[in-house]
Amino acid sequence: MVIAVATTSSIVSGIKLSGILTSFNAVDDASSSCGRSNLTGVRIFPTLSRRRFSSIGAVSPIRGDAQSSFSRSSFACSQNLGLSGGFSAAEALPPACANASPSSIKSFNQLIETLIDRVDLSETEAESSLEFLLNEANEALISAFLVLLRAKGETYEEIVGLARAMMKHARKVEGLVDAVDIVGTGGDGANTVNISTGSSILAAACGAKVAKQGNRSSSSACGSADVLEALGVVLDLGPEGIKRCVEEGGIGFMMSPMYHPAMKIVGPVRKKLKIKTVFNILGPMLNPARVSYAVVGVYHKDLVVKMAKALQRFGMKRALVVHSCGLDEMSPLGGGLVYDVTPEKIEEFSFDPLDFGIPRCTLEDLRGGGPDYNADVLRRVLSGESGAIADSLILNAAAALLVSNRVQTLAEGVTVAREVQSSGKAIKTLDSWINISNLAQKSQ
């Protein structure tokens, strides 16, 4: 348990609140529903509350490698995965024999037993486990690992270890300094219009440098790649093309399968399982541009603290982890919860769109459809059309401006994003991006 003394100060509206709150369990009891917090002592002000706890206590590993019965050396036996994607030999798995040794199989069996017993893995164990599974490419083993991890409940250490293993084999986009991503875990089942995609375009129109990652739909009618393709954005760009789009147009999109060849091994298993796995949580951490800043939406309020601690441990310069009324993004449905993550600390604040003059809406107001339908909606909203979807884009773009330090408060971000959205400037950003992406494709 981590016990901390909380202080409050608001970056929601620029109002400075000060004072000492009572001591409380800072990480284990955090939850929120539509902006209402059940945290002891937090309700100093109905919609503007914040608390702080030490990052040292928040992210220190709960057990070290010396305590584990399953070590990285168990997986020294490895071979080239046969994954295209441009990663160097130095980034590949350690070289050894063509097939897994009996000792590594035995060790992995021991790991499976520990998961059955609901014992958490260390960060190193999780990383080594995924390296072994990618090398073996055995669907039965991958399925067992993912299901048992989900049944036990993934820890932030496990999430970080798995993310490190994935990034070892990622195709990187270099040189995008101070870029931001707006990304969600998905899995909320709401089938809304592509809010994070539209928000990314709006944030770019506001001056942010956006390096967005995404994929085609897996759980909804239209994924980010689907709607961007319908809009005319070229998806199959290499690192130089992405860099050109971001530097010249303010925004670029990295198609996950192109940049994470290891997903060719894990992807088929996930499709067959048809359940949420740790890869739903991992996605936001796997940006090939290794962005400094991110707005990360999570589909369940219980994941907010876990994701915040994982992002901090992973080395994110600053991130906002958000959840609002069952959605993996900020929305006008109601209030929500945000964790502000930096290397030094993790702070929580609640927000309510009403404080920014944004009225409530229903889920039906945000409902999307197929790629062509969603593309048409986004074009209208980016051209200046008002309504619930415009309000959603404004909220999330404002969060991106805040996390990348382009504004000082969420309220200031909302003001900037609202002015740009209503002016129709964002549609020019989209059209410019489409043009640059097509030019970049021709020069590949």
UniProtKB/Swiss-Prot annotation:
Binding residues annotated for Mg(2+) 2, in chain numbering:
328-329
Residues bound to anthranilate 2: 270
Q: Does the keyword NADP apply?
A: no
> Where does it live in the cell?
Plastid, Chloroplast
Q: Which reaction does it catalyse?
A: N-(5-phospho-beta-D-ribosyl)anthranilate + diphosphate = 5-phospho-alpha-D-ribose 1-diphosphate + anthranilate
Major place of residence? plastid
Q: Name one Pfam family in it.
A: Glycos_trans_3N
Binding annotation for 5-phospho-alpha-D-ribose 1-diphosphate: 184, 187-188, 192, 194-197, 212-220, 224
Q: In which pathway does it act?
A: Amino-acid biosynthesis; L-tryptophan biosynthesis; L-tryptophan from chorismate: step 2/5
Q: Cofactor binding mode, per the note?
A: Binds 2 magnesium ions per monomer.
What SUPFAM superfamilies does the annotation carry? Nucleoside phosphorylase/phosphoribosyltransferase catalytic domain, Nucleoside phosphorylase/phosphoribosyltransferase N-terminal domain
Annotated keywords:
Amino-acid biosynthesis, Aromatic amino acid biosynthesis, Chloroplast, Glycosyltransferase, Magnesium, Metal-binding, Plastid, Transferase, Transit peptide, Tryptophan biosynthesis
PANTHER family annotated for this entry?
A: ANTHRANILATE PHOSPHORIBOSYLTRANSFERASE (PTHR43285:SF2)
Protein name per its UniProtKB record? Anthranilate phosphoribosyltransferase, chloroplastic
- Lineage of the organism: Eukaryota, Viridiplantae, Streptophyta, Embryophyta, Tracheophyta
Q: Provide the gene name from the record.
A: PAT1
